């Protein structure tokens, strides 16, 4: 997918292995000599917001985003963005559109992404249009491995267990 500037979008509830799979794909890309960066959406926004406030956005976009052939952005949708952050995030997606590849993870279905992007349906539609145009969408279902581990250890009860 990287050779064709395509994206991978991993969608599913918390704890089903989206981040693990994204990191494994990034590791394989790195082994193949592809310059790769992994960052959480929160850290990416902190980097971009700081650069914007310091009038250094163009340089940071080049150094932190465009310099990579594969950018992995983890946890889109866990924290809502204000309008400025949503605009900065859109700039990342637009900058890489057909010029690089993205792997993104999210716990939200696409129909709820506007709740993350400052309730801006127009920006969300434009962002999804670019992200999904050349994308492999991988829905992941299942029980959280973290909760499963806790249940196996007897630390929490399954639904329907007697008290």
Show which residues each predicted segment covers.
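Conserved P-loop
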Residues: 1-66, 116
